[in-house]
Amino acid sequence: MKVAISKLPDSGWWSKGMPKYNDNPAMIESAIPNLKLLNEERTKLKNVILQNGHDVIEFDFPDELDRKEPKHDFIFIRDSFISDQNGTAVILSARQPTRRIENTIVKKYLRSLNMDIIQMPNSPDLKADGGEFYLCKKDNILFSGLKRNSLQGAQFVAEQLKVKSMVLVEGEGFHLDTYFTPALNKRGRIAALIVCLKI
């Protein structure tokens, strides 16, 4: 498996303070992340991926997102798309308007890997963030949250990925990946679900 991650912005991740999104209780306006810790954790993440026999693809952080008004959320690269894990990516349409530029940029990066691209249509009814999905390929099940995904957006993704089942998960987190994750066994099948019941 190939795992795509973003390099950090040259200016340092939110080195002048992060923004606050109304639907994200974890963000503290103007907070500055601990960049030393961030770099250590990022190195550990890469090592774990490599030690488990997977490849790491590092995309350069886009210059156009590291300017006077930085858009550093791009490091959450999975928010912009979802892959069928077989060479096709669905480019999503972020609910947060300021993040939609990320969808456009990641499409260029994925094309450079010769991936087939499916573009979610630009429609007010179709909204989806990658952090709201888990695709369990071996079981052919798509889990979807509905905080930043619209129901129609989730259905569009399920249709494009040709999944057997889609499970809608309601929770308090702003993204499904903040309170829920499937645990897979060595064969890649769902063995357990890890759920945070209270945030």
Where are these regions (language model features)?
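The feature marks the mature, well-folded catalytic cores of soluble enzymes
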Residues: 1-199
